[in-house]
Amino acid sequence: MKPSLIEKLKTLTYRYSEIGGLLSDSTVINDQDRYRELGKEYAQLEPIVKCFQQFQQNEKAIESAEEMQQEKDPELRKLAEEELEQLTLKKEELEDQLKLLLVPKDPNDELNVFLEIRAGTGGNEAAIFAGDLFRMYARYAETKGWRVNIVSAHEGEHGGFKEVIARVIGEGVYSQLKFESGAHRVQRVPVTESQGRIHTSACTVAIMPEVDEIDQIKINPAELRIDTFRASGAGGQHVNRTDSAIRITHLPTGVVVECQDERSQHKNKARAMSLLQSKLLAAERAKQDQEQAAKRKSLVGSGDRSERIRTYNFPQGRVTDHRINLTLYQLDEVIEGDLDPVIGPLIRELQAEQLAELSGE
């Protein structure tokens, strides 16, 4: 392991010990915000420090085994050689673990998300495909134990959705779905096609982490136009007789959000404001990402919605993720919600890129 990484690990170990002392300090205990902040940092450092302690113990064991190799007794030398072989393998494993633990964590990984799917080119077929994508994500969410609540939806004339926005709630939602932002293309014979010709349609998917109260953007109420309307059957589970659905327009940016999922106007307004916050923050982050893209090109793509990230070819039963040149002939399984074979390689590709950067420091 590089000396710079060892020094970094020593610094983190010192910080871990320092926080341990602070958490028992009465001044810190009485300051709830500081105590919570330090407790979170302590929990994040703990697995790194514990792994580094194992690494240090293993290093000492290697030194002892190397000393034993100098013994005159051939049996002792043989034992030392066998032990050294095992310890060297363990050292490599611990080094890999430490490098992974040192990779910076995405602060949004544990957040819930807003999933937005819009039908693009392809007319009715694109709307039908948007419906297929929504069902794919809903089934994937079900396998993960997540909940999916539709916030707003506009149905297509022949089924599916022109646009659908849903809130996905659960553990580690963003960490798994963040790779889904972008343009998804489908190649198949539409139900409405009488000549049996293959058509190409597209949808855009946007994954927006739900804004934490700490991260919220300040919005001037004077810059909002709020309209109420009667909820339609498509948008939520409950069809209302009152004007409980909410549409909010952010005048400076033109961003429009709707919510008609809840029974009460108050709850719909709160959910719509949360979605607006997430959209504005996502736009701000996208702007920052574009500025950083010139300095650092990501292997998994920027997540820009104009970027074609995946093709679903039904005649060939093929799914291709263009960012990492991944091709799977498991279309039926993927479209039924088995997304792990697609998402797993994307996560590993990102980790490999981050590890390469870490090793090159």
Swiss-Prot record:
PANTHER family per the UniProt record, alphabetical: LD18447P (PTHR43804:SF7)
Keyword Secreted: no
Protein localization: Cytoplasm
Record keywords, A-Z: Cytoplasm, Methylation, Protein biosynthesis
SUPFAM superfamilies listed in its UniProt record: Release factor
Top-rank taxon: Bacteria
Pfam families: PCRF, RF-1
GO molecular function: translation release factor activity, codon specific
Keyword Repeat appears in the UniProt entry: no
GO terms under cellular component: cytoplasm
Predominant location category: cytoplasm
Family in the record: Belongs to the prokaryotic/mitochondrial release factor family.
Modified residues (N5-methylglutamine): Q237
The gene coding this protein: prfA
Function text: Peptide chain release factor 1 directs the termination of translation in response to the peptide chain termination codons UAG and UAA.
Protein name, per record: Peptide chain release factor 1
PTM statement from Swiss-Prot or TrEMBL: Methylated by PrmC. Methylation increases the termination efficiency of RF1.
Segments of this protein annotated with the region Disordered: 286-306
